[in-house]
Amino acid sequence: MIQVTSPEYNFSKHGDIAFVPTMGNLHEGHLNLIKAAKLESCFVIVSIFINPLQFNNANDLINYPKSIEADIKLLEAAGCDLAFIPEETILNDIDSIQASEQSNVLCGKSRPGHFDGVLTIVNRLFTIIDPKIAFFGLKDYQQFILIKNYATQHFPNLLIKGVPTTRDISGLALSSRNNLLNPHELDLAANIFKELCLIKTNFSLNKIDLLASEAKKNLEKLGFDIDYLDYLDGLSLKKINSSTSIIICLLYTSPSPRDRG
């Protein structure tokens, strides 16, 4: 596997590129993105860069899990062709991107500027690497929609593909931030998926308000601080109607408030 740190590297010499951007601390969810990329008969590039522009809290940035040596071994085992691990100088003279109004709901309500930071670094990575296809996990659904729509406007030849969320045996979505939870908190966090599944199983438009309210109450009884539990149109991220494709999203703080899910 090739390892590159310089943005000046000639990525285009490798032909069609399938790109997986990450912030490192890789897990099975990231590896599934790489598996999807390898199915495309392209040269697979994975970037590792902890982007300070998307953190609202300095402590979150400092405490974000880092495991670069282990990450490199995982990338090699997964068949990644090139690891792009830039220094923070990649941010020099960067064009700041303002996210669309779709960033004002869900996570964006409590994390102002977060998605601006995401799109700013993604725009630079796309410009540097010029991939044919880029892969993102659907766990961060709002981020996926924002990036997909941004790419449609500014990188029309780039295909953005979403990969389903990878979960552990309890149903908990795999996340680098899960490393900040102790075993008891991990067990409690499994209740998130259970409540979302109950909403899905019993869903109807005239019951959704009640189902969401009950799920929120159940989780709060366990000690969760629910930032939002919302249901929106899956494409526009606007309020639902009778013909909409619905996405149900939830953001919480664990009973020990050290992690945002």
Region locations from a protein language model:
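Nucleotidyltransferase catalytic core that binds NTPs
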Residues: 2-224, 231-236
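Long, charged alpha-helical interface segments
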Residues: 193-194, 227, 247-251
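A short, glycine/Asx- and small/polar-enriched loop/turn
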Residues: 240-246
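Conserved small/polar residues in nucleotide/adenosyl-binding loops
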Residues: 252-261
